[in-house]
């Protein structure tokens, strides 16, 4: 399996896990949050779409100026799924309440993930040459960004599971 195949598999697995996490949620559960500072499942879902669309837009327009700045970052990216460290979202990636129901989100997420996968699998795309900065991890190339998208999704699935495990989480 190539590195691209592995990244595409991680994207597919994280997408399936996300859908499985939100599928059973009632409208009340979809919008519930334990406190004002914590995102609801709906807000997490919106954030994931905003991030993925933003990354793809930036990658498509990133200069193809090399791999050397990004060596060894795959190991660092593995830390992204750990919820012990918080990464505050920039204002442009903070949810605004766009998705009143999971079905609304699923359409946009499917479109975003399909666009990401299609771009990555395009034979004219050299993933290693499209480099752009991450606010925490520094310069990453396109393949590393694909891994980051998958791991970012897994990180937020863990956040949804934390909400579901909360003692005040609504029954339905």
Q: Model-found features: residue ranges?
A:
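Short, contiguous alpha-helical
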Residues: 31-81, 121-172
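A short, mixed-charge helix-start or loop-turn motif at secondary-structure junctions
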Residues: 1-4, 98, 135-142
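An N-terminal domain-cap segment
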Residues: 1-12, 16-38
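Acidic/histidine-rich alpha-helical segments that form the ligand environment
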Residues: 10, 76-129
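Soluble, non-transmembrane catalytic domains of enzymes that act on hydrophobic metabolites at membranes
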Residues: 4-10, 18, 43, 50, ...
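Residues on one face of amphipathic alpha-helical coiled coils
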Residues: 13, 17, 24, 111, ...
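Short hydrophobic/aromatic-rich motifs at helix boundaries and adjacent loops
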Residues: 1, 13-14, 27-31, 85-90, ...
């Amino acid at each position: 399996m190539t590195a691209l195949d592995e990244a595409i598999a991680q994207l597919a697995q994280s997408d399936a896990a996300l859908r499985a996490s939100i599928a059973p949620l009632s409208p009340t559960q979809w919008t519930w949050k334990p406190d004002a500072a914590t995102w609801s499942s709906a807000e997490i879902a919106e954030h994931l779409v905003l991030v993925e669309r933003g990354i793809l837009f930036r990658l498509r327009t990133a200069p193809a100026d090399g791999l050397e700045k990004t060596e060894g970052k795959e190991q660092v990216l593995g830390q992204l799924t750990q919820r012990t460290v918080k990464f505050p979202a920039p204002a442009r990636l903070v949810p605004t309440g766009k998705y009143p129901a999971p079905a609304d989100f699923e359409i946009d997420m499917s479109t975003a993930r399909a666009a990401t996968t299609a771009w990555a699998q395009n034979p004219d795309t050299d993933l290693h040459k499209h480099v752009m900065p991450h606010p925490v991890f520094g310069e990453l190339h396109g393949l590393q960004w694909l891994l980051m998208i998958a791991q970012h999704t897994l990180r937020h699935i863990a956040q949804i599971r934390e909400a579901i495990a909360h003692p005040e989480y609504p029954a339905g």
